[in-house]
Amino acid sequence: MIKSVIAGAVAMAVVSFGAYAAPTIPQGQGKVTFNGTVVDAPCGIDAQSADQSIDFGQVSKLFLENDGESQPKSFDIKLINCDITNFKKAAGGGGAKTGTVSLTFSGVPSGPQSDMLQTVGATNTAIVVTDPHGKRVKFDGATATGVSYLVDGDNTIHFTAAVRKDGSGNPVTEGAFSAVANFNLTYQ
């Protein structure tokens, strides 16, 4: 009997200890925000492609002044979950059926050269972007890049960018620079 009383007392002590335990105190907090846009298009744009940043690092003033271009930096526009059923077009006059996409870029052109994007930051530099077909992109918001053929699923469109002396005739100066270009897709 004494064993039963002792066992009961121990059980009560264990149960009551849990009732008097200190409440859990949060040790940090945060917030997660979810954003997106639903579009009426055959493809979505990968989130990392929709807002990109290209870092040219440090570029030689002397090299740019002598009409040089920085090392080209590659960037991609990734189209995801494409369903081109309603946009099919014969590719190259035969063979497989596929849809197409072209892009237009807009930004502040460097003077009359709409194929150079003006930089901000008094360095007298500009950005040039080359499309997948080796042609310079125009930043006029109207001139489309060459057509890229699409397949169902994911597609990647490759571009390169470089910094160079702008067309102002002013010498290249030291300092930080930046530029922003926006792109729009047109499917056919």
From Swiss-Prot:
<dbReference type="Pfam" id="PF00419">
    <property type="entry name" value="Fimbrial"/>
</dbReference>
<keyword id="KW-0732">Signal</keyword>
<feature type="disulfide bond">
    <location>
        <begin position="43"/>
        <end position="82"/>
    </location>
</feature>
<dbReference type="GO" id="GO:0043709">
    <property type="term" value="P:cell adhesion involved in single-species biofilm formation"/>
</dbReference>
<keyword id="KW-1015">Disulfide bond</keyword>
<dbReference type="GO" id="GO:0009289">
    <property type="term" value="C:pilus"/>
</dbReference>
<dbReference type="InterPro" id="IPR008966">
    <property type="entry name" value="Adhesion_dom_sf"/>
</dbReference>
<comment type="similarity">
    <text>Belongs to the fimbrial protein family.</text>
</comment>
<dbReference type="InterPro" id="IPR000259">
    <property type="entry name" value="Adhesion_dom_fimbrial"/>
</dbReference>
<comment type="function">
    <text>Fimbriae (also called pili), polar filaments radiating from the surface of the bacterium to a length of 0.5-1.5 micrometers and numbering 100-300 per cell, enable bacteria to colonize the epithelium of specific host organs.</text>
</comment>
<feature type="signal peptide">
    <location>
        <begin position="1"/>
        <end position="21"/>
    </location>
</feature>
<dbReference type="InterPro" id="IPR050263">
    <property type="entry name" value="Bact_Fimbrial_Adh_Pro"/>
</dbReference>
<dbReference type="InterPro" id="IPR036937">
    <property type="entry name" value="Adhesion_dom_fimbrial_sf"/>
</dbReference>
<keyword id="KW-0281">Fimbrium</keyword>
<protein>
    <recommendedName>
        <fullName>F7-2 fimbrial protein</fullName>
    </recommendedName>
</protein>
